[in-house]
């Protein structure tokens, strides 16, 4: 339908009692887990809580959906898929924290690997050793440097802004991302970290939930 989610939320926000909930990856130690306590007890009592379970199915498959749309953008722009370097910004379960528990960014990472791409994750908020131990993902030391301090030497085919850390907007504006990417710059901006109009005006390929 080509309806922009942010525009819908802004319009709905003109109602005084509107509660704003944005689409994204639902991870962490509570929201992504606690509903199952309720559904388990409900089913023991003979009730099938379809609405809650449907919501969890959608959330649990969001990483796959984002990865698939990233691949579609590579195809649409004529970029390679096999061996494509893809940068993922952020791995904590939400913005501006260090907590990596039940991060759904890992779902994007694994799905991209299934397409034989080379996903790289950078998150200055996360503890490298914990991410390595928990998810077997070696975080970049910088957006162009591998965990072994070896330059990647190849630009990224796409960049996924997975977590809306303030530091990403401050340290990595669009012109910086353009410098490390093949043309056109593909930005998969899950929670709207960057300005959509600015991206499109600069000829970038932009997609968000």
Language model features by range: what are they?
Residues 1-209:
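Structural/interface elements that position substrates and couple domains in central-metabolism enzymes
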């Amino acid at each position: 339908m080509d309806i922009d989610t942010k525009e819908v939320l802004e319009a709905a926000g003109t109602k005084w009692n509107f509660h704003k909930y944005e689409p994204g990856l639902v991870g962490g130690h509570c929201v992504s887990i606690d509903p199952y306590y309720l559904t388990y007890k409900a089913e023991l009592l003979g009730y099938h809580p379809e609405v809650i379970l449907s919501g969890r199915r959608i959330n649990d498959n969001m990483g796959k959906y984002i990865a698939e749309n990233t691949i579609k953008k590579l195809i649409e722009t004529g970029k390679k898929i096999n061996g494509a370097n893809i940068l993922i910004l952020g791995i904590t379960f939400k913005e501006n924290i260090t907590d990596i528990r039940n991060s759904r960014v890992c779902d994007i990472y694994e799905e991209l690997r299934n397409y034989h791409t080379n996903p790289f994750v950078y998150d200055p908020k996360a503890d490298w050793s914990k991410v390595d131990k928990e998810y077997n993902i070696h975080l970049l030391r910088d957006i162009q440097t591998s965990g072994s301090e070896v330059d990647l030497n190849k630009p990224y085919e796409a960049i996924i802004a997975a977590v809306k850390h303030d530091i990403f907007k401050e340290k990595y504006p669009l012109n910086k991302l353009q410098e490390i990417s093949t043309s056109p710059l593909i930005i998969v901006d899950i929670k709207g970290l960057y300005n959509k109009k600015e991206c499109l005006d600069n000829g970038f390929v932009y997609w968000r939930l």
